[in-house]
């Protein structure tokens, strides 16, 4: 294949014009101690500290990189492309501790990734000439360095370690298909062929112990989890509870085995691997155990609540009973007789009131008789990592229901729905479809699971139906294909293709799409796989997962609302161009290398799907072939970038024409993934297809600490909308504040000096203000000094020890004075109400959540769904996205959202209602933690507190030690600040 240059020049380094800098990356404990530090590393100058940290801490190879290398001579491989090995002769000249180390330059990483792809592409015959291969190598290195695209994490971890450094190790049980014959062979090296795939779908048969069965799946899952990949399976083949077994007896049912798999995944998660087990469990809506599956996580969350509440009640009341048995004034057996001991009677009565088991009460009295004065009863919390969640089931997977059009039509028509047995297709139970739908909606409302996958839509867009149905997805639901296949992902950073004049660089975007399609295709050839079956089918169908990130950021920069016809039209056009180009390139590769092995039997169906994609790209509203739900076609009238629309139409013309002539090299080419970690390494403001979540963020500093910044797209958007530089500065200052009280209204340096503030105290205060979420959190004994607060401000030690102390109010400032100063110093953290900002421009800055304390606006549920629907007709797979819903959303709202997603042609959707998980950080604060148990009045709930608020409140606690009562009640609250866990423990006592 020919490879053109769009970013680089032949004969020049691809890094020419890309500035680099020396940086440091470190991880610190909350106490300031350093856990990890890598200094004097070479990184692109434009990269943020977060991007540098991800690269250095996650993607740099930490060991085994030789200090001296030599090339390996290979026949017909250009000298610049030859693989490298340790130069042992040169290494022996070095001290032993200097011979091997880790990667220390971003260029090393870019070179090993791009070099490995080029090397395997050359060996596989993908390039017409060495010049084309070199152009491919240079263009990819430039795009990586300038954050235009990034592959999924396994590529960064594994790709190129053998080619670039000669790193090798014993085989780990992987397999690879011979590129020429397709014969699957067992790998004899751990590193020669990398494992670049992040997403897997695995089958499971209704068999207990044989290969391909239930227990075998846990082993196959474990092999994937161990290496950081995710997997999904459809468990609908498993018999329901009480179905007959071949050897006699009754099946224990689907749920009993799902709980085993959940435990296995949880054990691996806690076994020291780099990340949680990523797992998707899918069950068809007609399975006899579907109702229990739907409510699984709801019930388990209720168990967590019971464990938390019950353990605390046991601890409190049983120790009260124990203490009452040892109160003074009574002797002998009288102490243990509630008729004689009024304190004991009162304690027993209180315990019975909260329904403590009678035998626990009796056992405690017996314990007291033996002289014991304290019961050690473990108490649990709703922390996600706590023993409470470890105790219950269902916490190690995403759960999804497969629903068919037939089921959804019966929901709307009020019809009946049969749950069918697995062994003989008999009817296990008949219920109203609406009742089951309501159960699904209630479960999603209460616990954010299950998600919904639209089975009919998925399979009507299936390119290879002759080879089998699509039954399942990967853990994030963007990859949907045949069982026992894998997909490797990469995502293009859309903001890097937005020109300064507001136009979209269509040519370079298409060029980049072409190159990264080739990268992913080469990755299929060079990869090794965790099982023989996956190796065989991945070779046979060669599915790819190219996508994009930063759509929300790009639309904001362009001054276009996420929830607008214009925003949706642009998303549709970009997606249409991307997938059209990938299939055109796939057809080009098929011409040179042949179509994928499974193409011929699926040819007619695949071309039908291609024609439907093309119709959608041309904006057609009818004449789709074999589709029950019409897709949302491209709305060219609302897309300002007309060249983008034309390019997408031409791409689909070419994709269909070339495909009809040569077939396709790949059964699928695109998905839209969540782009979490790779979004950070590309400095994306938004991930995948998501909108932004906040306008003001905390930026990490190289030396530690954070400061507030406005989303980088906000000033760009304001300029696009016609605001002048001084207006933009005013709006930004309104949002982020001035970070100082020097010239603030009401509470400023002059006002504080009158209260006794000295220059050194004011200096300490000023240092704390730039990173403060609220000025109240800078006014604390830790910042100002305990002695100053007591001796100068006249605040007693007792008050200084109070966690809820409002020091500003204590020294005489009013609420209105505080609000004026706080807005000046810390900003509104929103642009709503900003001076000079026109109301008609507010939608451009709408985010997934309300911004700051003053923000009221946020994107509605339907805006997320409609955006997904604008892109879905042009995606081979699906879109990974969770729809955020406010805490006030109802069960009916959840059901309506799922129904709208089906009607608009989506393949899958998941919901998250704010506050629907017990483990959601700080959700308890929403009702006010100061509500006493004996309060009779019902008070209005406070607004949800943010993590930064609570974390900074800790600073109000007294720094001197105060002796507390030996026995006191309280609660423990966990938060996460800057990636560090913070535990807030309160003690409540009489004063």
Predicted regions and their residues:
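Extended catalytic cores of very large enzyme megasubunits
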Residues: 1-991
């Amino acid at each position: 294949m020919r490879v053109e240059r769009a970013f680089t020049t032949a004969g020049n380094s691809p890094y020419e014009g890309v500035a680099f800098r020396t940086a440091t990356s470190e991880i610190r404990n909350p106490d300031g101690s350093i856990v990890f530090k890598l200094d004097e590393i070479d990184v692109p100058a434009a990269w943020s500290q977060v991007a540098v940290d991800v690269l250095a801490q996650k993607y740099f190879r930490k060991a085994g990189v030789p200090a001296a290398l030599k090339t390996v001579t290979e026949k017909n491989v250009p000298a610049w492309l030859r693989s490298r090995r340790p130069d042992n002769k040169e290494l022996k000249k070095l001290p032993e501790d200097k011979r091997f180390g880790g990667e220390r330059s971003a260029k090393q990483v870019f070179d090993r990734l791009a070099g490995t792809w080029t090397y395997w592409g050359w060996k596989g015959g993908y390039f017409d000439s060495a010049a084309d291969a070199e152009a491919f190598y240079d263009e990819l290195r430039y795009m990586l360095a300038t954050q235009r695209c990034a592959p999924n994490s396994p590529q960064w971890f594994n790709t190129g370690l053998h080619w670039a450094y000669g790193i090798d190790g014993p085989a780990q049980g992987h397999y690879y298909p011979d590129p020429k014959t397709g014969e699957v062979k067992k790998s004899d090296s751990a590193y020669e062929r990398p494992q670049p795939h992040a997403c897997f779908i695995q089958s499971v048969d209704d068999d207990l112990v044989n290969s391909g069965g239930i227990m075998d799946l846990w082993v196959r899952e474990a092999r994937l989890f161990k290496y950081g990949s995710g997997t999904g399976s459809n468990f609908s083949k498993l018999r329901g509870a009480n179905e007959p077994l071949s050897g006699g007896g009754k099946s224990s049912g689907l749920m009993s085995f799902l709980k085993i798999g959940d435990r296995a995944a949880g054990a691996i998660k806690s076994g020291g691997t780099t990340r949680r087990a990523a797992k998707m469990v899918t069950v068809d809506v007609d399975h006899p155990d579907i109702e229990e599956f739907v409510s699984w996580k709801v019930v388990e969350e209720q168990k967590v609540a019971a464990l938390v509440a019950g353990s605390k009640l046991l601890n409190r009341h049983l120790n009260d009973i124990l203490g009452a048995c040892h109160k003074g004034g009574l002797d002998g057996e009288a102490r243990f007789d509630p008729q004689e001991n009024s304190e004991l009677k009162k304690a027993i009565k209180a315990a019975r009131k909260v329904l403590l088991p009678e035998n626990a009460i009796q056992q405690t009295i017996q314990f007291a008789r033996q002289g014991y004065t304290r019961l050690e009863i473990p108490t649990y919390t709703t922390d996600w990592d706590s023993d409470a969640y470890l105790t219950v089931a269902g916490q190690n997977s995403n759960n999804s229901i497969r629903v068919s059009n037939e089921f959804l039509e019966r929901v709307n028509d009020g019809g009946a729905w049969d749950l069918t047995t697995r062994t003989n297709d008999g009817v296990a139970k008949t219920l109203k479809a609406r009742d089951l739908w309501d159960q699904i909606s209630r479960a999603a409302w209460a616990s954010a699971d299950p998600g919904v996958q639209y089975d009919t839509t998925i399979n009507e867009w299936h390119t290879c139906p002759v080879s089998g149905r699509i039954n399942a997805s990967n853990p994030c639901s963007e990859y949907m294909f045949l069982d026992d296949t894998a997909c490797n992902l990469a995502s293009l950073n859309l903001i890097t293709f937005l020109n300064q004049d507001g136009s979209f660089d269509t040519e370079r975007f298409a060029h980049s799409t072409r190159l990264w399609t080739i990268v992913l295709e080469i990755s299929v050839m060079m990869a090794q796989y965790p099982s023989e079956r996956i190796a065989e089918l991945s070779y046979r169908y060669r599915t790819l997962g190219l996508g994009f990130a930063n759509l929300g950021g790009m639309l904001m920069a362009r001054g276009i609302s996420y929830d607008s016809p214009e925003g949706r039209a642009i998303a549709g056009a970009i997606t249409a161009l991307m997938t059209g180009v990938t299939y055109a390139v796939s057809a080009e590769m098929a011409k040179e290398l042949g179509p994928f092995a499974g193409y011929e039997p699926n040819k007619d169906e695949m071309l039908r799907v291609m024609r439907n994609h093309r119709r959608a790209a041309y904006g057609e509203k009818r004449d789709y072939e074999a589709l029950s739900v019409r897709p949302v076609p491209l709305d060219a009238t609302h897309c300002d970038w007309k060249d983008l629309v034309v390019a997408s139409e031409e791409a689909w013309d070419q994709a269909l024409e070339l495909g009809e002539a040569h077939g396709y090299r790949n059964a699928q080419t695109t998905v839209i993934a969540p782009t979490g970690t790779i979004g950070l390494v590309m400095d994306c403001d938004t991930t995948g297809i998501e909108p932004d979540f906040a306008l003001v963020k905390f930026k990490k500093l190289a030396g530690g600490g954070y400061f507030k910044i406005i989303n980088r797209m906000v000033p760009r958007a304001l300029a696009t909308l016609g605001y002048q530089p001084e207006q933009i500065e005013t709006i930004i200052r309104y949002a982020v504040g001035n970070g100082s009280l020097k010239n603030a209204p009401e509470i400023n340096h002059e006002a504080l000096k009158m209260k006794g503030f000295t220059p050194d105290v004011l200096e300490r205060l000023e240092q704390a203000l730039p990173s403060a979420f609220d000025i109240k959190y800078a006014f604390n004994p830790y910042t100002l000094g305990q002695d100053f607060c007591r001796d100068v401000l006249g605040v007693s030690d007792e008050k200084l020890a109070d966690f809820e102390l409002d020091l500003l109010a204590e020294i005489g400032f009013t609420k209105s004075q505080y609000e004026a100063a706080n807005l000046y110093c810390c900003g509104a953290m929103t642009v709503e109400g900003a001076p000079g900002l026109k109301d008609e421009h507010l939608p451009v800055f709408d985010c997934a959540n309300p911004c700051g304390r003053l923000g009221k606006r946020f994107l509605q549920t339907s805006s997320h769904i409609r955006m997904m629907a604008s892109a879905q007709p042009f995606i081979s797979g699906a879109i990974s996205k969770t729809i955020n819903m406010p805490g006030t959303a109802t069960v009916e709202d959840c059901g309506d959202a799922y129904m709208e997603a089906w009607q608009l042609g989506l393949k899958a959707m998941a919901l998250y209602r704010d506050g629907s998980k017990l483990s959601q950080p700080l959700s308890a604060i929403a009702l006010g933690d100061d509500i006493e148990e004996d309060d009779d009045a019902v008070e209005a709930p406070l607004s949800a507190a943010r993590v930064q608020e609570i974390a900074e409140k800790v600073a109000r606690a007294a720094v001197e030690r105060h002796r507390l009562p030996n026995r006191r009640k309280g609660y423990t609250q966990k938060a996460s600040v800057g990636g560090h866990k913070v535990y807030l423990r309160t003690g409540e006592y009489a004063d």
